Design a protein with these regions (language model features):
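Extended, compositionally biased alpha-helical segments that mediate assembly or anchoring
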Residues: 1-66, 288-408
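Alpha-helix boundary/N-cap detector
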Residues: 6-9, 31, 39-54, 152, ...
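Generic detector of well-ordered alpha-helical segments enriched in charged/polar residues
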Residues: 9-16, 52-60, 155, 170, ...
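Short glycine-rich, low-complexity/disordered patches
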Residues: 31, 69-76, 174, 186, ...
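Assembly/oligomerization interface modules of large self-assembling protein complexes
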Residues: 50-137
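Intrinsically disordered or highly flexible coil/loop and linker segments, enriched in small
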Residues: 68-69, 167-178, 248, 395, ...
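Long, contiguous amphipathic alpha-helices that act as assembly "spine/axial" helices in icosahedral shell
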Residues: 121-195, 382-390
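Extended, solvent-exposed, turn-rich assembly/linker loops in the middle of proteins
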Residues: 190-323
Length: 408
């Protein structure tokens, strides 16, 4: 079933399915407009509550089964099978090789012990908890009766309600995913920026460019003028370098819990690249855009993001490349536990965010336990309610690779 429109034959199929559910009789079916009205009237007269419940269940089940996530950050959604392998993660750290030349120094009358124990470095992390999403839609009896007055009306009603459910679901999951991205940017900048033991946490691209080229450009210089083209060529090269570093087995862009020598690599096919679209537009007009997209981005999950957090603030001073968070979650590498950092009232901005490149296991969301419940008709108000409920579980694993790119 299309979310935007329905063919007449699809409407007949829906009506016949509802008729079978409500009456338990599959003999009387709708095959034309006249027959459609007869079947619809029979159902409504017999049990209006059951008709409404069957109709809404049909609509919502179609939406949830197809999951058309045409929204930003869609790559962060994982299914139950993938999530089951994430909530309890077993990781193995590198241990030093044993310097042993016993086989070169065999001595008569002595044995060589080959039962020496090396238990290895094993790290187990667990992720718990979920949040509940719940929303309600109200449909009046007059709307339901009008919907069953003909196949075109029912098709329009189904398409409208399907769009309503899909839009609510899409917006909710996008907001959750956006929150995870914002948390990653703020936590990386506040907690891990500048760690020499673990490079690649945050790259300050303008400062790096000025240091390497002995220039003194600012954020305004990269938008137009003579400095724009060489700078964006530099950024394009740095993005390729970051992707190559993430693909190599090292500690670039990740944190290690003390006492555990976990080393990772992220193949290009498992990299996610989220970059701010307005800046990407500048890059494409300043460099060979086709060559850029034919680089390593073609192998990664690349997405141009319209804005990071909001399109405007109350004082109209909220650029598209700015994020802020009054609290964020980060990994305490001393204890291996996650902590909440309350910044307080003076919430710092993270300005000029170009984007982030990360492993697909760095952050994700799982939507589960989707439930649709319909109320009987309200006897006084003559309306029905449909409640949509679901649980959302999400994680952010700072022992996985993630590099934040800032234009400062």
């Amino acid at each position: 079933m299309s979310v935007n429109q329905m063919q007449i034959e699809d409407v007949y199929a829906v009506l016949n399915s509802i008729h079978g559910q409500v009456t338990g009789n599959a003999d009387m079916v709708a095959i034309n407009t006249s027959n459609f009205v007869s079947v619809a009237n029979t159902m409504l007269q017999q049990n209006t509550d059951a008709v409404y419940s069957a109709l809404m269940n049909t609509i919502t089940k179609t939406i949830f089964s197809t999951r058309p996530y045409s929204r930003q950050f869609g790559g962060l959604i994982v299914d139950n099978l993938k999530w089951g392998g994430i909530i309890r993660k077993i990781q193995f750290g590198d241990t030093d090789a044993v310097a042993d030349e016993a086989f070169h120094n065999i001595v008569d009358g002595q044995s060589v012990d080959h039962y020496i124990v090396n238990k290895g470095d094993v790290l187990e992390t667990r992720y718990y908890g979920s949040t509940v999403y719940q929303d309600v839609m109200t449909v009046f009896r007059d709307q339901l009766v009008n919907a069953f007055s003909g196949p075109e009306q029912l098709g329009s009603f189904i398409a409208a309600k399907a769009n309503e459910v899909n839009n609510k679901w899409t917006q909710w999951t996008e907001d959750l995913a956006r929150g995870l991205v914002i948390n990653a940017i703020v936590a990386k900048r506040e907690q891990y920026d500048g760690w020499q033991e673990h490079p690649g946490q945050v790259l300050h691209l303008i400062s790096m460019y000025n240091d390497e080229t002995r220039s003194s450009i600012t954020i305004n210089d990269i938008k137009a003028g003579a400095s724009a083209k060489p700078f964006w060529e530099y950024v394009r090269a740095k993005i390729r370098t970051v992707q190559r570093m993430l693909a190599s087995r090292n500690t670039y862009g990740m944190m290690q819990i003390n006492g555990h020598n976990i080393v990772r690599h992220t193949p290009y096919s498992r990299q996610k690249v989220y970059l701010l679209a307005p800046y990407m537009d500048l890059m494409e007009t300043s460099t060979l855009s086709e060559a850029f997209h034919n680089d390593m981005l073609q192998y990664a999950d690349y997405e141009g993001v319209a804005y990071w957090q909001a399109i405007r603030e109350q004082n109209n001073d909220y650029p598209l490349d700015r994020v802020r968070a009054s609290t964020y979650v980060y990994l305490d590498i001393e204890t291996g536990k996650y902590r909440n950092a309350n910044i307080g009232e003076e919430v710092p901005f993270v300005d000029h965010v170009l984007g982030l490149i990360f492993d697909e296991d760095f952050t994700s969301i799982n939507i589960k336990d989707t439930i649709v419940q319909n109320t009987p008709m309200n006897a006084r108000g003559l309306y029905f309610n449909t409640w949509l409920s679901a649980h959302a579980s999400y994680l952010q694993d700072f022992t996985e690779k993630c590099c934040v790119l800032l234009l400062d």
